[in-house]
A protein has these predicted regions:
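N-terminal acidic leader/helix
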Residues: 1-27
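Charged low-complexity stretches with an acidic bias
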Residues: 1-6, 55-75
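Amphipathic alpha-helical interaction surfaces
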Residues: 16, 20, 39, 43, ...
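Amphipathic alpha-helical segments that form the core helices of the histone-fold
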Residues: 30-42
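Short, charged early-sequence alpha-helical segments and their helix-coil boundaries
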Residues: 43-59
């Protein structure tokens, strides 16, 4: 089983399916990656363990980005 540890790993997983995400803001990229993962899983292309692992990585990264925004006073 593939173990995904960071955002780069999730990007590489999506790349295997021809999905490249770059919207210009890291938080937006993470949100779109989560949507794409959902679509791949619903289509039966991802194993549940890999899907959940990737979603957990994205959740962690998204929370980190939100924390940075709060600290900088942005929203």
């Amino acid at each position: 089983m593939t173990v995904l540890k960071n955002l780069y790993d999730v990007q590489q997983l999506l790349k295997k399916y021809g999905i490249l995400v770059h919207l210009g803001k890291r938080k937006w990229d993470i949100e779109l990656m989560a949507i794409e993962l959902d679509n791949l899983y619903k289509a039966g292309l991802l194993e549940k363990k890999i899907y959940l692992n990737a979603k957990l990585v994205l959740k962690h990264e998204h929370e980190y980005e939100e924390r940075l925004e709060r600290e900088k006073g942005l929203d």
